[in-house]
């Protein structure tokens, strides 16, 4: 994923080092030298956010994996984001949560995690982006920008939509999907 930041700040200032422009998402399966490889990537200083996205793991497994990832993220000054689960954000004391359109409502998520970061998927829709901005999402994500080899691409976004959205918001923008 690639992080775009418009000049200025979003609804609540989200400090983003301009040298750190990557929003990295975990693989579907954690195995082998994952933690060692993650540390090697994060130590480069190019990653702003790391999202733990583990759809097929139990809560107990996610907590165990999340504790290890959080430690690596903290050491490398990378924001640790949890996909879809504000309650897990609280359990792990992660930096925030990423919500898809079918996940929990941002208002409810804010009640659960307070002032932590909440980002919202907007697919390829300016209307969804406007709703997320109005709800005070700390960043908005568009995609997929490329087709996947592993799953069907439902929404295809383009640079054109990012340019349109940048004209009316200072909220940071993330390009996701197949990158």
Show the residue positions of the predicted features.
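Active-site micro-motifs of SAM-dependent methyltransferase domains
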Residues: 147
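EAL-family c-di-GMP phosphodiesterase catalytic domain
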Residues: 150-151
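Conserved cofactor-binding/catalytic machinery of classical short-chain dehydrogenase/reductase
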Residues: 161
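Conserved N-terminal beta1-alpha1 strand-loop-helix module at the mouth
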Residues: 1-4, 8-138, 154, 164, ...
């Amino acid at each position: 994923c690639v992080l775009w930041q418009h000049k200025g700040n979003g609804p609540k200032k989200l400090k983003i080092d301009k040298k750190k422009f990557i929003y990295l998402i975990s693989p579907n399966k954690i195995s082998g030298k994952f933690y060692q490889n993650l540390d090697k990537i994060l130590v480069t200083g190019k990653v702003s956010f790391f999202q733990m996205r583990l759809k097929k793991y139990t809560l107990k497994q996610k907590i165990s994996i999340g504790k290890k990832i959080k430690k690596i993220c903290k050491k490398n000054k990378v924001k640790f984001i949890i996909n879809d689960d504000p309650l897990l954000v609280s359990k792990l004391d992660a930096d925030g949560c990423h919500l898809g359109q079918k996940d929990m409502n941002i208002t409810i998520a804010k009640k659960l995690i307070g002032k932590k970061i909440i980002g919202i998927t907007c697919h390829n829709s300016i209307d969804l982006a406007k709703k997320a901005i109005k709800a005070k999402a700390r960043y908005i994500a568009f995609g997929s920008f490329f087709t996947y080899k592993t799953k069907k691409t439902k929404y295809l976004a383009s640079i054109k939509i990012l340019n349109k959205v940048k004209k009316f918001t200072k909220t940071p923008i993330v390009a996701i999907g197949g990158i």
